[in-house]
Amino acid sequence: MIAPAPGYRISAATGLHRGDRAYQQDQVELLLHPRVKGCALAVIADGMGGKSGGRKAADQVMLTAQQTFERYAPGRDDAQDTLRQMVTEAHLMIRLTAITAEEEPHSTLAAFLLNPAREVAIAHAGDSRIYHFRGPQLLSRTLDHSFVQRLIDEGRLTEEEALTHPQGNLLTGCLGTQQDPPITLATIERLEVGDALLACSDGLWHYFTPRELGAIIDGLPPRDASEMLVNKARQRARGGGDNLSLVILRLEPLG
């Protein structure tokens, strides 16, 4: 925990599990700014591409995130521009690693950047998600760059039907492809005390409704909530679970 300003503290935790896959190709980072209190970056990457390509792609996302955040200066640099640059640079570096990979490496990305003024910048590409909760209530979440999300947008599929659709894992864009990655940016003007952010890969969110996520994240400290979400996802996967990764960050009142 860190206490960036009077009245609240930041409480956070990460989670990572291989699931039932042979290889771990998800990666997660929660970074505190080296020079500015109350500034943090959370990043999720879900890599794809053979036994090594996906891991290389996810690792490249993490390395680029670390380097970008190291250069970031709150108050001087625009947070959304910084996240856009991070996605673009990671995409280009993944493209370079494709030269030595047995399969073309790809990765999703979901990231949020919290500034000391409690403004949050959000970026995502692919089907890794970011949820914003106030208490147990969902205020917003990112929309996937996926085939089934397109069907949902067109009114041809419900959220529930999308979970069991045979092409549910087909992405319409991500990092490392020959096309530029889709980058969806958003801003939360001010995170309130009691608010929580969840970034996670599809290996986690696939097994929960937003109501369940909100109840668990609101009812437990972030570390305990992370452990419960991982354990429940593993149970519900019934031996067929994907890699999963998550970050929970919550503003808590002091005292």
Which residues fall in each region the model found?
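PP2C/PPM-type serine/threonine phosphatase catalytic domain
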Residues: M1-G255
